[in-house]
């Protein structure tokens, strides 16, 4: 999914650990043991747009930022082989999905490496605000001054070239005086914010629009029609399954119950899971969040629960993905 997408939908059988495999695909790198704490330089943290922009000013050293520091997975070749075997009908590991504990033991960063990262953060004035059981991510917060010192960079403020706002970004790639390899640091910039790709267009009310034959009022389409179009004749309803949705906005529960009533669908239990503080005020993109929930119910009317993982925009994607994998609820 593109960086501009507002959400990700993950649907998978209860108890399986496919979400950890998703993280594997996103974060696989071969760990290289190093001796002394030589300075390592990371890559991919400076937005390309800053190459042609001049900083408006430097961020205040007293301002706080939340960061998610990611460690690489281990045994990359073994993980690739295991992924292939899981989807190979001829393999003895076909559909033999790993538990969270198994995945962490075989491929997750080691406990000593995770503790070394925690010690590095605390030594450099950063506060650990969340740890993850799979040890893939460490969430920290700190002042801009401490972040600049820890990662040997300057946090600058720029005028966004396409949006009516400013954004912050580092002036150089972060580097760390740390012996263990680090994969990525999320949260150093807010140049690209997740947003929906839909575009609202005004309707010319003087023109008589004749909708196609949907099952809704006046022939309008409902989610049920997509189920009939894409999986006609299926008896599968997702009975007893749970679904996890990744969202950067909230929704109004009354919108969902109204849709269920009007579409003749059952009332599905919704469980909100706040990440990085969650959504305190429902925003302008609530319609897309509601649409995702309604589409899941329409396509899988027997679904037992929908877990809605909500995080403020912006928040590190990896925070939500790691939480979903570690919860292992859907």
Q: Which sequence ranges carry the predicted segments?
A:
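Bacterial N-terminal signal peptides that target proteins for export
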Residues: 2-22
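Sec/Tat signal peptide C-region and signal peptidase I cleavage site
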Residues: 32-36
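Short intrinsically disordered, low-complexity coil segments enriched in acidic
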Residues: 1-2, 330
